[in-house]
Swiss-Prot record:
Compartments reported by the entry: Cell membrane
Statement: the UniProt record of this protein carries the keyword Cell membrane: yes
Presence of the UniProt keyword Cell membrane in the record: yes
Protein name: ATP synthase epsilon chain
GO terms assigned for molecular function: ATP binding; proton-transporting ATP synthase activity, rotational mechanism
Job description of the protein: Produces ATP from ADP in the presence of a proton gradient across the membrane.
Alphabetical UniProt keywords: ATP synthesis, Cell membrane, CF(1), Hydrogen ion transport, Ion transport, Membrane, Transport
Superkingdom in the source lineage: Bacteria
Pfam families noted in UniProt: ATP-synt_DE, ATP-synt_DE_N
InterPro entries: ATP_F1_dsu/esu_C_sf, ATP_synth_F1_dsu/esu, ATP_synth_F1_dsu/esu_N, ATP_synth_F1_esu_C, ATPsynth_dsu/esu_N
Protein family (similarity comment): Belongs to the ATPase epsilon chain family.
Topology versus the membrane: Peripheral membrane protein
Subunit structure, as described in the record: F-type ATPases have 2 components, CF(1) - the catalytic core - and CF(0) - the membrane proton channel. CF(1) has five subunits: alpha(3), beta(3), gamma(1), delta(1), epsilon(1). CF(0) has three main subunits: a, b and c.
Length: 137
């Protein structure tokens, strides 16, 4: 049976490297499923969870991906992101604290009507919520 080779790469190194039968990611155009034999492509990714179905009996892996790009070339899938964490590596307490900090920063930015700070806080909040969601899987 054909399989994908999936790598998730960040500036800190390879965060995930395994074979898969299906991966699901979120792009600005919506959710995308990649199966073996998928057409070659490069696409931007949203801050979202990535679902990796390993072979039939091996289960599912979840990775919190904070944006980046996906490249599919033959049956090699490479995700390049600023940061990414596997569900098993996420410290939920730390993620909850990051969410609280982002909420406070967003509230302050809204009060002062600082658009740049508001955008930064919104991104930080999305990332924290994504990490919490994946960490609970």
């Amino acid at each position: 049976m054909a399989q994908l080779t999936v790598q998730v790469v960040t500036p800190d190194g390879i965060r995930y490297d395994h074979h898969a039968s299906l991966i699901t990611v979120r792009t600005p155009d919506g959710e995308m499923g990649i199966l073996p034999g998928h057409i070659n492509l490069i696409a931007p990714l949203n801050v979202h969870q990535m679902k990796i179905n390993r072979s039939h009996q091996e289960g599912v892996d979840w990775v919190a991906v904070n944006g980046g790009i996906i490249e599919v070339n033959e049956d090699q899938v490479t995700i390049v992101a600023d940061s990414a964490e596997r569900a098993r590596d996420i410290d939920l307490n730390r993620a909850e604290r990051a969410k609280e900090r982002a909420e406070r920063a967003l509230e302050k930015a809204q009060t002062t009507q600082n658009i740049d700070e508001m955008r930064r806080a919104e991104v930080a909040l999305r990332r924290a919520i994504n990490r919490i969601s994946v960490g609970k899987k």
